[in-house]
């Protein structure tokens, strides 16, 4: 298979996944559709190295990982997270519940390595899945490498319906209070909706100088420093270099060296994500029907234990912080899918319950900020850190 043939096939599969997800309003996740198509291809006529043949090979994959995670760090606004500290705490405690049950009951039943591999993907997104899959592959644990990917692919099927149900219960409570006059709708002022640009140590470059090369150069330098320091500290602090990339992304943006969302500004984000998604599905080349049948029970068990721990702890902390148990659980559930499903599910719930535009705006203003912060806290930040720590347990 030629380079362009392989590239076209890989992108067609990813595109079909997106189309199905859009048509079903994210009820059927794009990653699930793509995973099924890749499995069918690998079991029939795809060459096992189709992703590598498409040009997505190790050097560019590693580069995209470093740049993407550093980019993710620039998205972190300490001020925004501080304003939503209760949502942040609920999301983190929910993840704590996942870890508590998967690493105790899950590890006891399915084995320590199985729990270690599957837990980080369950607390976040694609980056955590890739970190754990690569670690398992490096140790010759091919079956567990596939488990990391399958966990990432399947967890949304648990998260979507549960979140939708929780948000509808919460929405009914809110809309009843709004219609009775018990809850007021305070529309945010335009100044509150606009992003506050804090003073930076390093002034922002004029827009005309924010070219693709300049933006990527600064992002690359930041990742280089992060990985260099992480490598130097590895004998003393055994944390993945990806964690340092996340931290240095935060610092670089805070001081003004790197702009917020540099990959988006440079027009590179879509291609970087494409590289990572293609790479994660490449791991399914080793997934035989027999292997998947063997993984079905551990997969289901780890997800059940994780979600059970999440619901218990998130509802407890939510009650202590003044949230309803449904809203608290919904915030924690964002760990299973992140953005954009957290936005889509919230909007769908608001549309279903609202009788007019004002009621929809009210419901969105009450639920969406918490859902967005929950997804950002879990998928963008916590999952990378957890995966960076858990790889040392193997």
Segments from the language model and where they lie:
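Hydrophobic alpha-helical transmembrane segments in multi-pass integral membrane proteins
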Residues: 45-47, 101-108, 133-136, 141, ...
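Alpha-helical membrane segments and immediately flanking helix-loop junctions
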Residues: 109-150, 154, 162, 324-378
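Intrinsically disordered, low-complexity non-transmembrane regions of multi-pass membrane transporters
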Residues: 1-11, 167-216, 348-370
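Small-residue-rich segments of transmembrane alpha-helices in multi-pass membrane proteins
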Residues: 32-44, 66, 90-103, 120-130, ...
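Structural signature of multi-pass alpha-helical membrane transport proteins
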Residues: 2-58, 72-74, 197-269, 283-285
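Juxtamembrane and boundary regions of transmembrane helices in multi-pass small-molecule transporters
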Residues: 103-111, 151-197, 316-323, 375-394
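Structural signature of hydrophobic alpha-helical transmembrane segments
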Residues: 1-9, 53-67, 113-122, 236-248, ...
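Entry/N-cap segments of selected transmembrane alpha helices
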Residues: 58-64, 72-104, 216-220, 270-276, ...
């Amino acid at each position: 298979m030629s380079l362009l043939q392989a590239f076209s096939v890989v992108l067609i599969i990813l595109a079909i996944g997106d189309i199905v997800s859009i048509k079903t309003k994210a009820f059927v996740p794009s990653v699930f559709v793509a995973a099924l198509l890749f499995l069918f291809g690998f079991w029939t006529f795809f060459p096992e190295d189709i992703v590598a043949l498409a040009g997505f090979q190790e050097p560019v994959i590693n580069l995209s990982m470093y740049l993407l995670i550093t980019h993710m760090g620039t998205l972190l606004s300490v001020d925004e997270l501080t304003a939503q500290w209760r949502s942040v705490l609920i999301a983190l405690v929910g993840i704590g519940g996942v870890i508590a049950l998967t690493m105790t009951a899950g590890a006891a039943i399915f084995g320590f390595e199985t729990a270690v591999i599957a837990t980080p993907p369950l607390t976040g997104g694609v980056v955590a899945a890739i970190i754990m899959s690569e670690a398992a592959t490096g140790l010759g644990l091919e079956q567990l490498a596939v488990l990391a990917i399958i966990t990432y692919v399947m967890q949304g099927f648990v998260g979507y319906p549960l979140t939708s149900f929780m948000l509808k219960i919460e929405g009914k409570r809110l809309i009843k209070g709004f219609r009775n006059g018990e809850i007021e709708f305070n529309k945010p002022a335009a100044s509150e909706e606009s992003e506050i640009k804090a003073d930076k140590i390093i002034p922002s470059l004029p827009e005309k100088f924010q070219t693709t090369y300049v933006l990527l150069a600064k992002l690359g330098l930041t990742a280089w420093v992060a990985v260099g320091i992480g490598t130097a500290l590895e004998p003393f602090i055994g944390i993945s270099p990806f964690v340092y990339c996340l931290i240095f992304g935060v610092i670089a943006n805070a001081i003004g060296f790197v702009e917020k969302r540099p990959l988006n500004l440079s027009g590179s984000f879509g291609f970087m994500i494409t590289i990572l998604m293609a790479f994660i599905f490449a791991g399914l080349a080793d997934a035989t029907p027999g292997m998947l049948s063997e993984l079905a029970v551990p997969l289901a068990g780890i997800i059940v234990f994780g979600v059970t721990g999440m619901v218990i702890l998130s509802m407890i902390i939510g009650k202590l912080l003044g949230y309803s148990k449904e809203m608290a659980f919904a915030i924690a559930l964002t760990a299973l899918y992140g953005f954009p499903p957290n936005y889509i599910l919230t909007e769908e719930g608001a549309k279903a319950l609202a009788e007019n535009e004002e009621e929809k705006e009210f419901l969105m203003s009450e639920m969406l900020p918490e859902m967005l912060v929950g997804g950002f806290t879990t998928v963008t930040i916590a999952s990378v850190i957890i995966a960076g720590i858990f790889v040392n347990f193997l």
